[in-house]
Curated annotation (Swiss-Prot):
The keyword DNA-binding applies. This is Transcription elongation factor GreA. Keywords: Coiled coil, DNA-binding, Transcription, Transcription regulation. It holds the Pfam family GreA_GreB_N. PANTHER family: TRANSCRIPTION ELONGATION FACTOR GREA. It comes from the Bacteria. Necessary for efficient RNA polymerase transcription elongation past template-encoded arresting sites. The arresting sites in DNA have the property of trapping a certain fraction of elongating RNA polymerases that pass through, resulting in locked ternary complexes. Cleavage of the nascent transcript by cleavage factors such as GreA or GreB allows the resumption of elongation from the new 3'terminus. GreA releases sequences of 2 to 3 nucleotides. The keyword Transcription regulation applies. Residues 13-75 form a coiled coil. GO terms for molecular function: DNA binding; RNA polymerase binding. Belongs to the GreA/GreB family. InterPro entries: GreA/GreB_C_sf, Tscrpt_elong_fac_GreA, Tscrpt_elong_fac_GreA/B, Tscrpt_elong_fac_GreA/B_C, Tscrpt_elong_fac_GreA/B_fam, Tscrpt_elong_fac_GreA/B_N, Tscrpt_elong_fac_GreA/B_N_sf. Residues 113-142 are annotated as: Disordered.
């Protein structure tokens, strides 16, 4: 697992803690019951149900380890104490994209919480990393997988 910080909002940390609690309590219990039920059917060496339950158990334990690692490295983004003079993790940034009408607003978050469809972009993404440290009215050129984008920062919250 990585040693680099995992940037999270308070809500993001709470969601991960709730997911971890659910996996450790309910998830482990359900899979243990499935494994025991498959064992009761007899020969487990050729049991598809047993093999499926063991695979799900491995997946569940992997997710538990992943969440624990993220929480251990968590650095909480203080969204209320925002500096609107430059883009940082936690900033809500409004940009104008050259060649397009209107504006886009994105929140810069850690990679764990990134959901572009919800306007949350990772600080590690091409756009997110290019915006970090920039100020209002500054122009930014970003190389993305789909080509070069030219942005103008309109507002930072």
């Amino acid at each position: 697992m990585s040693d680099k910080p995992a940037y999270l909002t308070r809500d993001g940390r709470a969601r991960l803690e709730a997911e971890l609690e659910e996996l450790v309590t309910k998830g482990r219990k359900e899979i243990a019951e499935r494994i025991n039920a498959a064992k009761e059917l007899g020969d487990i060496s050729e049991s598809g149900e047993y093999e499926d339950a063991k695979n799900q158990q491995a997946h569940l334990e992997g997710r538990i380890r992943e969440i624990k690692s993220i929480l251990a490295r968590a650095q909480i983004i203080d969204e209320e104490n925002g500096d609107n003079h430059e883009v940082r993790i936690g900033s809500r940034v409004t940009v104008r994209i050259d060649g397009e009408d209107g504006e886009e607003t994105w929140t810069i978050v850690g990679s764990t919480e990134a959901k572009p469809s919800e306007g949350k972009i990772s600080n590690e993404s091409p756009i997110g990393s290019a915006l970090l440290g920039k100020r209002p009215r500054q122009k930014v050129t970003v190389e993305t997988p789909s080509g070069t984008m030219k942005l103008t920062i309109v507002d930072i919250q």
